[in-house]
Structures are given as C-alpha cells and as structure tokens.
Regions:
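Eukaryotic intrinsically disordered and solvent-exposed regulatory patches
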Residues: 156, 175-177, 205
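Beta-strand elements of modular eukaryotic interaction domains
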Residues: 160, 178-180, 207-212
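Short, Lys/Arg- and Gly-enriched loop/turn segments at beta-strand edges
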Residues: 222-229
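Short nucleic-acid-contacting surface segments enriched for D/E, G, S/T with interspersed K/R
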Residues: 203-219
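Short coil-to-beta-strand transition motifs
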Residues: 158-170, 215
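OB-fold (S1/OB) nucleic-acid-binding surfaces
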Residues: 173-200
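Long, hydrophobic alpha/beta structural blocks
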Residues: 1-159
Length: 229
C-alpha cells in the first residue's frame, strides 16, 4: 500500500501513503538517535500544537539537505495515519447556524493564535480567557451530557512516543482495501480532524461499528508524513 516511497523506508517499517495536501508549513526535521529514521515537526494553527510525525521520505530529505535546499523552507506535507483499532461514533447533530458559528469561532481563534505566536500580548490574553470560558461551559455540560456529544473532533498527543496521537474526526470517505503483504482486510478512511484532512488505515476486524461518510472515527494513530520539497 503506497507507491514511490524510498525502499529503505517501507522495507523496514509499516507505512501508509496518504493523498492530497494536509498542510503548508515550515518543517523542522531531526534524525532519531537510535535508528536511521527521521521525524518532522511542524505547527498548524488549526490544531494549536506542534505536530511530530515519522518522515516517509527521509532519504530524499537528506539529499535535499546536502544540496542546501531545506533550510527554513515552507512546503506542503501529506499526513497519513496507521491505527491498530478504532471505534465508529454517530455524528453530533448541528443546525446550519451552529455550523456557521463554529466556523467563525475557528477562524477567529486561528487569527489569534497566529498573532500570539508573534508575541501579541492581547491575543495571548484573549486566548487564555477563551480557554477558561470554554472549560467552564464544557464542565457544566458534562454533568448531563456525554463528552462525545459535546466534543465532535480532537487531536491529542498519546503516550510516550512523540508521533502517536489520539484522534477523533469526521469520515469524509471510506473504502476497503487488502494489505498485499499480510492479506488483512483494511478500512482506508479520509478524515477531517480539527480542520486537518488526511487518510488513515486500520484493520477492518479491529473497528467497532460500521464506518460511513458523516460518522466519526475515534482511535489512536501513528502519524506519518511525506514532505514535498
């Protein structure tokens, strides 16, 4: 699964090649100390955290680095995720006005986060107060509602490994595939997670529920990425 990746990468570790462009960002790449493997780090204002991922085209990156073409380069990244299992959840019911309000709030928050990164003290204070207000509202709702009826998507670091994340996102597309190395039946899903769009792959027999467009996938993924130089 996946075509055109360096042989040294997919010969040694599992991989899944995603599609499209997930984000445009300045990428920092570091080699893992214990192995010939590279991790990338980028920031995306949609998520609000630094994303660390296993780099699929590390050999190509080293070639570009030796040519002096990678320093402070803002480029596109295609993310993909490998999951061992997961759960399918029904969507949160929202009307058009709620969707519009959330879109406006998300755009405003993104602008504030960009300003905060540049040292804007007013933006930092606004974000702090907004987070406190959100925490208060969610805490009150949790007394009578299930958390998954309040939070419809999230992207959070998971465990000690820097490139593992716990996610929940809307299913935009789904299809079945077969792992040609193992013969295992897989679900390939395209997800919208905190406005980041990327593909994941998970063994079909390890998914609780039936994935359909509009429903949500919840699970833990190993985040991989392909940098386009």
């Amino acid at each position: 699964m996946g075509v055109g990746l360096p042989a040294a990468f997919h010969r040694n570790i599992p991989y899944f090649e995603g599609s499209g462009v997930t984000t445009y960002a300045e990428i920092d790449v570091q080699r893992k100390i214990e192995k010939e493997q590279y991790v990338g780090l980028c920031e995306d204002s949609k998520i609000g955290i630094s994303l660390i991922f296993t780099l699929q085209n590390g050999v190509e990156y080293m070639r570009e680095k030796q040519a002096g073409l990678t320093k402070d380069v803002q480029t596109s990244v295609t993310f993909s995720g490998l999951a061992q299992d997961g759960m399918i959840l029904l969507p949160v019911n929202k009307n058009e006005q709620q969707i519009l309000n959330e879109k406006r709030a998300s755009d405003t928050r993104r602008e504030l986060m960009n300003a905060a990164r540049k040292g804007d003290q007013a933006a930092i204070e606004t974000l702090t107060f907004d987070d406190m207000d959100l925490y208060s509202k969610v805490s009150k709702r949790l007394a009578n509602e299930d958390v998954f009826s309040i939070v419809d998507t999230y992207f959070m670091p998971f465990g000690a490994e820097c490139d593992m994340y716990s996610i929940m996102g809307e299913i935009l597309a789904v299809r079945e595939r077969i792992n040609r190395m193992t013969g295992v039946r897989l679900y390939q899903m395209r997800l919208n997670v905190n406005e980041l769009t990327f593909d994941i792959c998970v063994p079909a027999d390890s998914v609780m529920g039936e994935p359909e467009i509009g429903r949500r996938f919840k699970g833990t993924i190993w985040l991989q990425g392909y940098i386009t130089f």
